[in-house]
Amino acid sequence: MPHSVLARLPPGSVRLVAAFGLLLLVSLLVLHRRPGRPHVAAAAASDRLTDPSRSRLFLSQSPGANASIAADLRALTAGPHLAGTPASAGAAAHVLARLRAAGLQTLTREYEPLLSYPGHASLALLRPDGSLLARLSLEEPADEGRRVVPPYHAYAPSGGAVAEAVFVNLGREEDYVVLERLGVGVRGRVAVARRGGGYRGGVVARAADKGAVAVLIAGNADGGVERGVVLLGGPGDPLTPGWAATSGAERLKFDDKAVKQRFPSIPSMPVSAKTAAAIIRSLGGPAIPAEWKDGLGVDTGGLGPGPTLVNFTYQEDRKFYKIRDIFGIIKGQEEPDRYVILGNHRDAWTYGAVDPNSGTAALLDIARRLGIMLQSGWKPRRSIILCSWDGEEFGMIGSTEWVEDNLEDLHSKAVAYLNVDCAVQGVGFFAGSTPQLDKLLVDITRQVRDPDVTGKMVHDTWNEMSGGIKIERLARTDSDFAPFLHHAGIPSVDLYYGEEFPGYHTALDTYNWMEKHGDPFFLRHLAITEIWGLLALRLANDPVLPFDYQAYTSQLQEHIKTLSALTSNGHAVNLMNGCVNDLSGAAMEVLKEMKKLQQMDLYDEHARMRRRLLNDRLLLAERSFLQPEGLQGRGWFKHLLYSPPEDYESKLSFFPGIADAISRSANLSDKEQEVAMQHEVWKVCRAIQRAASVLRGEFSEQKPTNFSSLVTP
């Protein structure tokens, strides 16, 4: 692989890259790639195994692989390995050694971001006169050996409070509406919330907006206390937004407006269910609504405020630490400058058996299998990069810094990013993807045996469990696909077994739990490994990329239907339907072109050039959905279809700019809301039209479409 994939490159225009890339490709192919034996030989080497043969060879290595996966997971989870600690460096060494043992070329990239660790913390209940009533534990009952980092919220500011407490349920807007109706306010008080109200940083931010002076978030009643990050405004190092946090890089000051917006304004802390219950039992005020008691384990107490006081102090320790991303690389034989990227993070809040090292063990088994295939003489058509990220638990830092470090290279060369974080956390297969990868994903699950039902394939049980195949869209920011999709516009997939895990981010996330409860025979690990690896093989080897933009248009049409139910702005809906129809036409044309090329001689030079150009259009179309300046007020997020909305409680999980406009204008008249939405609607429409033009391989100005009639009252 060219070293440039890991080189630092200056940021630039997405559209300029796309146009320049296409022109450069045409020039290189026409001027330099004349028919000749070397090119035929390279193509023959990469295509020596047909797709069924490649799949069979990959799957033939499954017997006994579950034992290998289990051994890697046991080694990785022998102790806690939080990013920035010596133990984390040990986990990195294990991954590096296993990639090298598989015969892959390896690279390591270091970054030096700002990380946050806990210092001193204390919590006590006081009587109304200020005398001590009880000291409350901030430790985790499940952590008997006291080996893991104490529960804390990364990047929560140092501070303290002596104030009355209020129970705010999940800390959502609707919960504060209930409190207001009951005459309970949180201004100047400590908000006590229970887990389940969405992103913890959003829960803290909403409490601060309501005037709270501190927030305590209760864990589940099983003894675990959920650690986590509370930064706002997107992933990555908070002091280097948009560029890599390399040693000696420019760093913004803490008083910079962009930095201050990312850090919470009040201290917060995760606490055990037992500690939260002790506080709630001491509260008076209105009775707790019955539906708010779920999982609390309290039968007395009220919503507050008071009469007892909470005395809470917290001291944060912020430092710059080195983190290490590790890469295993297989250089493509025919198209080495096209990258199929598989990623999983390596760092963990505690032992990490589920999050993330179930995925790490699967990644290492893929490396082992690909190494055996290389020894057999196989080489992929395109390059395959296996990525082991560091610093994910602090806000996807390792992956984000690498994407920012290599943005131009990725814009022009990345085919897709395939993510696995918590590979196995329970029963049932779940997946998210950008829509053009849906069909490929579904097809792959027809090739993999279901780990829980004998005689069935994953596709069968997935379909039965969900009442039809359901694929999530990746607008959330809780794993490493976020920088690839939301910032770089790279088609992405996320895979996992099990919807929820009670030990998430707690000391319960151990190898022992996995062996006893999560996946005793490691067969779900095996299924994820096979799906993940087969996806990579198809994307790295199919002569024509298996992208289906008809599925994208169908999904956009569904999104528009959902939007139309939330707004009375019929003009906006009509406008968007017109743009999607244009994309649908382009997708149909591409589908016909794909079928023609699939019938042509694989080694014909003219056909090879046409395939290359078509593939470039297919991979660049997703970049068309990027807005170079980003979303309003949130410039790091650039994807106009699938970035997270500003309001984490928004009813829209797509069209984030439109979702933000709706949220910001919620208290305005219908006419004012329409005006607020209109500009964001046009942005989305222009992006969809750009994608249609890219798919057709033409300048957008060549076929201007008149949509004025659609928006004329």
Curated annotation (Swiss-Prot):
State which Enzyme Commission number(s) the record gives. 3.4.17.21
Glycosylation (residues): 66, 311, 667, 706
Q: Which GO terms describe its molecular function?
A: carboxypeptidase activity; metal ion binding; metallocarboxypeptidase activity
Q: Which InterPro entries match?
A: PA_dom_sf, Peptidase_M28, Peptidase_M28B, TFR-like_dimer_dom, TFR-like_dimer_dom_sf
What Gene Ontology cellular-component terms does the record carry? plasma membrane
Please give the knockout or disruption phenotype noted for this protein.
Altered meristem development. Altered developmental gene expression in meristem and non-meristem tissues of the embryo. Altered pattern of aleurone differentiation in the abgerminal side of the endosperm.
| Residues covered by region (Catalytic) | 245-539
- What is the designated name of this protein? Probable glutamate carboxypeptidase VP8
Query: Which organism does this record belong to?
Result: Zea mays
